Every structure is written in C-alpha cells, then in structure tokens.
Design a protein with these regions (language model features):
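Acidic, glycine/proline-rich low-complexity segments that act as flexible tails and inter-domain linkers
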Residues: 1-23, 51, 76-98
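Mid-chain, well-packed structural core segment of small domains
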Residues: 35-60
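A generic alpha-helix surface/boundary motif
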Residues: 4-9, 26, 42-44, 60
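C-terminal structural segments of small proteins and small subunits
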Residues: 67-75
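Short, structured motif recognition centered on aromatic/hydrophobic residues
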Residues: 25-33, 63
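Short alpha-helix boundary/capping elements
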Residues: 10, 32-38, 71
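Short amphipathic alpha-helical surface patches that mediate protein-protein
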Residues: 64-67, 83
Length: 98
C-alpha cells in the first residue's frame, strides 16, 4: 500500500506535471537530496538525471553550487558519490569532469 501511494504520488501526480522539464526536476531532486544528506537516493537520482539529459558539465556546476549553498563538505560528498556511481557505470568521471 505504501509503495503504491509513493509511486502514484511521486510519478503520476508530481513528475507528470509539465511546467518543469524532467531535467530540471532531476536537478531539483539532486539539490534537495544533497542538502538533506540522502546519499543512497542521491545516487539513484544521478542515474535518472543522466537519463533526463543532464550532462557531466551541468552536474559539475550543480555540485559546485551545492558546495556554495550547502557547504563544502556536502559538495565533496556530491563529487564522491558521483564518482562511485560513474565508476560502476564504466564512465571515467575525472576525465569527463576535468
């Protein structure tokens, strides 16, 4: 029941709205999840962000902005978790984001 509620609410009622692009929704989610230290969900939404058209350069800028507004340790965590995620995906994040 709970999973059904979450799926219906998040995906059908919120994500189906049309005023923000899915890419923008992904950026918003990454910011919110980073600022609240929800790192497992952050990594999950990294995959969604890539699927929604976010590129490495945009993510780098996003993480820098997160570092400014949420604190450098949070920005460091963003880069750390992104590096782990992309390593598992066989993408060299250091090369892509340098």
């Amino acid at each position: 029941d709970f999973q059904e509620f979450i799926t219906d609410y998040c995906w059908h009622q919120v994500w189906d709205k049309k005023h923000l692009s899915n890419k923008q929704k992904s950026f918003n989610n990454l910011c919110i999840l980073a600022s609240t230290n929800k790192w497992p969900e952050f990594k999950l939404h990294l995959n969604g962000a890539i699927n929604n058209g976010c590129n490495f350069y945009e993510l780098k800028e996003l993480f820098l902005q997160i570092a400014v507004y949420c604190g450098v340790p949070t920005g460091v965590e963003c880069f750390k978790h992104a590096e782990e995620f992309f390593k598992l995906s066989d993408i060299d994040i250091n090369e892509e984001m340098s």
